[in-house]
Amino acid sequence: MKKVYFKTFGCRTNLFDTQVMGENLKDFSATLEEQEADIIIINSCTVTNGTDSAVRSYARKMARLDKEVLFTGCGVKTQGKELFEKGLLKGVFGHDNKEKINALLQEKKRFFIDDNLENKHLDTTMVSEFVGKTRAFIKIQEGCDFDCNYCIIPSVRGRARSFEERKILEQVGLLCSKGVQEVVLTGTNVGSYGKDRGSNIARLIKKLSQITGLKRIRIGSLEPNQINDEFLELLEEDFLEKHLHIALQHSHDFMLERMNRRNRTKSDRELLEIIASKNFAIGTDFIVGHPGESESVFEKAFKNLESLPLTHIHPFIYSKRKDTPSSLMRDSVSLEDSKKRLNAIKDLIFHKNKAFRQLQLKLNTPLKALVEAQKDGEFKALDQFFNPIKIKSDKPLRASFLEIKEYEIKERENHAVF
């Protein structure tokens, strides 16, 4: 039986998609060791030029090693054809064909199968286990109806559509029966869940919370305008992780308008302050170096960031994507300036995060941590605020949910003895 190795680039949605493909392998076996694989399946990402480059490099490397390489994911529409025509790939297939992986692997001839995004395809595969066992990523929707000027993803994932609630509940129930204790709800635009089905993400979360064995629910990312009063009521519930990732993308209205974003700084501040008042950690995304971000604009944006109750951030440098409105804008920002701004933001939120952790210690807040791994004599876990904690213990703590009352604050994580 030939062995298949999955190389996954990009987001949590791609991780779930890889699990879907793995579940559909019938005449092949999956391996975690790249070198022993006969076939490499690249599940690609195309969110930035950097990810495109990393994907290309990996495809070339595998081709040089004389591996049989299949290519799928968001990169199919941006560089799949180019890599295929160069002879680096045995086959290319779009998102709609993941569940046909077993048949595709048996194809004798080279093939190129793209998606028709008008089909609004949704997978039906039930994932029976998840790598990592205790935490699982659950895709609840696909696609995005937002039209942000810088973003290429709607053109490769299609418009927003939601999985059936019954299927999601069944999927989570199955995984929890096999030891999963925490789920991370993911998708292209998670907060849009239910819009096409007369429901919403708050109602889904309430039903998920009733599943036996599920101890914590985490949400991948939300848009500010998707958080309504019904969702805010959930902040009082113990089953929801005390951390929300809210995609602001910038903290200056001029840039938000430039990006064709739906949020604005005043309402963003009001929302974040409400959430922070519930003792929640708050993360966000932030794009630096988008066309139009002058020095004065960034300085004002940075001051706004300083005053926001943020604890985590995923900042990245604007990446020019072909055929997006932003790619046609001329007032670009130098890479040197972009890097300086990126580092300034990272440093700011690093100190905010440490201050938040110190506050929790002062308030005698116990950390509720899910232990995921053991390395170098220490256990690694994530607490309810999405902060890492290292735990020294002689006990078999793997896959345990702990309440830690005594801990130390270190530079980048908390430490404890249990």
Swiss-Prot record:
Q: Which GO terms describe its molecular function?
A: 4 iron, 4 sulfur cluster binding; metal ion binding; N6-threonylcarbomyladenosine methylthiotransferase activity
Matching PANTHER family = RADICAL SAM PROTEINS, THREONYLCARBAMOYLADENOSINE TRNA METHYLTHIOTRANSFERASE
Residues binding [4Fe-4S] cluster 2? 144, 148, 151
Residues recorded as binding [4Fe-4S] cluster 1, renumbered to this chain, are 11, 45, 74
Q: Which UniProt keywords apply?
A: 4Fe-4S, Iron, Iron-sulfur, Metal-binding, S-adenosyl-L-methionine, Transferase
Positions of the MTTase N-terminal domain: 2-110
Which co-factors does it depend on?
A: [4Fe-4S] cluster
Mind telling me what this protein is named? Putative methylthiotransferase jhp_0270
Q: How is the cofactor bound?
A: Binds 2 [4Fe-4S] clusters. One cluster is coordinated with 3 cysteines and an exchangeable S-adenosyl-L-methionine.
Q: Which Pfam families match?
A: Radical_SAM, UPF0004
UniProt family annotation: Belongs to the methylthiotransferase family.
Which EC number(s) does the record attach to this protein?
A: 2.-.-.-
Q: Which residues form the Radical SAM core domain?
A: 130-355
Cited CDD domains: Radical_SAM
